[in-house]
């Protein structure tokens, strides 16, 4: 059987789709069904470290996507999953549930350096391969008014750590070390390596 010339993207994130397009990779969405509780997969377990957390969540997402592909009887092709989390020390900053939580997170990040961890996993048949990207982001001090204005924009909602690096918050980011695409949600260097290993020509 010839190798597939496309990948299933098991993500609803427009940013990840955009990044995958930068690689020139053909993809098909493998979105969760309406009855799938994807948010439950992102629950933190006890004193789980940020690295252990992001790897575990990515594996759970890949498990769910693999089962989804089987149920739908899809043609064989690599399945790509990814998860991103923001960590301040050992504290995991997930997606804020509301404006108050977004405000609290941004106060923590203001004037500090934090890590952004993105795990990527690809399944090709029974084989699974993984990679992890860790970057560091430094925020300049933000005033209460600046935080309030940013939260009011709605941009922090649905984003790990309550911000989108490619959005308005960029004016407060003083330094980045690592993978910009990884901070956005899909580290392209690691992703390209995984897809090549799965048989795609990039």
From Swiss-Prot:
Keywords from the UniProt entry: Cytoplasm, Hydrolase, Nucleotide metabolism
Annotated compartments: Cytoplasm
Tell me which residues are marked as the site Important for substrate specificity.
15, 84, 166
Q: Where is the active site?
A: 83
Q: What does it do?
A: Nucleoside triphosphate pyrophosphatase that hydrolyzes dTTP and UTP. May have a dual role in cell division arrest and in preventing the incorporation of modified nucleotides into cellular nucleic acids.
- Name the protein family: Belongs to the Maf family. YhdE subfamily.
Q: What is this protein called?
A: dTTP/UTP pyrophosphatase
